[in-house]
Each structure stands twice: as structure tokens, then as C-alpha cells.
């Protein structure tokens, strides 16, 4: 059971993401619907995050920076395709909206595997 931050300004997508994470047995942190709330929630103990690129008038890159600095793996969600993501984040996991459950599950599994790899490296002497 992992603690996963959900950040999306679209209530239907946020609710779907929460439901799917719960169905997969994970603990949902949030959801946050704006950048300020997301930055506050990002201070929690997290295993991963699902982050919408565009949050109303704000972009989520300050949150992506904060998560990266803490070593928290995250996936960016967007309806704009790869060109809608800043170049420095194009190699991160992505979920193109609308996304299906099978794709979502695969991305969550990949994020959690990255987190376990990070923890193993940090624990090594």
C-alpha cells in the first residue's frame, strides 16, 4: 500500500484517479486542485504522485521541482501531448488524457518500482 499524491484541477479526473488508486489498494493523499494546496501536501511522506501539468492559471512545474528534489517519483497528466510539457520533464512518466485503467495501473506500478529502486540505493552502504 503506497501513499500517492493526486493533483488535478478537474474534479471528474481527480475523482476517477482517487477511485482507481483506492481500487489498487493505495492511500490517496489529497487531492489538491491548485498549486498552493499541492505544494503543501507535497511535504507529506509520499511514495509517488500523479500531477496534472496545467492547474487552472498555474503550471505544476514548481511542484514537479519539489517532488524531484525529494526524490518522489511522479507522472504528469496532460491533454496537450508531449509538446505541452516543458522539455526538462518530457522524460518523466506521462498519462495522456483521457487515460484508461490499464495504462494508469502500468504507470503507477512503474512509479512505485522507481521509488523502491531509489530506497534500495539509499539503503546500500
Task: Report residues per predicted region.
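Alpha4 helix (beta4-alpha4-beta5 surface) of REC/receiver domains from two-component response regulators
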Residues: 62, 69, 80-97, 102, ...
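Short hydrophobic/Thr-rich beta-strand motif most characteristic of the beta2 strand and flanking loop
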Residues: 26-33
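Short hydrophobic helical patches associated with two-component signaling proteins
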Residues: 16-21, 104
Amino acid at each position: 500500500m503506497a501513499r500517492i499524491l493526486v493533483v488535478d484541477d478537474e474534479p471528474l479526473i481527480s475523482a476517477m484517479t482517487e477511485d482507481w488508486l483506492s481500487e489498487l489498494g493505495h492511500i490517496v493523499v489529497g487531492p489538491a486542485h491548485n498549486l498552493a494546496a499541492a505544494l503543501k501536501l507535497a511535504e507529506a511522506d509520499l511514495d509517488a504522485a500523479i500531477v496534472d501539468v496545467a492547474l487552472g492559471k498555474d503550471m505544476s512545474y514548481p511542484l514537479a521541482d519539489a517532488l524531484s528534489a525529494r526524490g518522489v517519483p511522479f507522472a504528469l497528466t496532460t491533454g496537450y501531448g508531449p509538446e505541452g510539457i516543458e522539455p526538462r520533464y518530457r522524460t518523466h512518466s506521462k498519462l495522456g488524457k483521457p487515460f484508461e485503467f490499464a495504462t494508469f495501473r502500468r504507470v503507477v506500478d512503474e512509479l512505485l518500482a522507481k521509488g523502491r529502486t531509489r530506497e534500495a540505493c539509499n539503503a546500500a552502504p
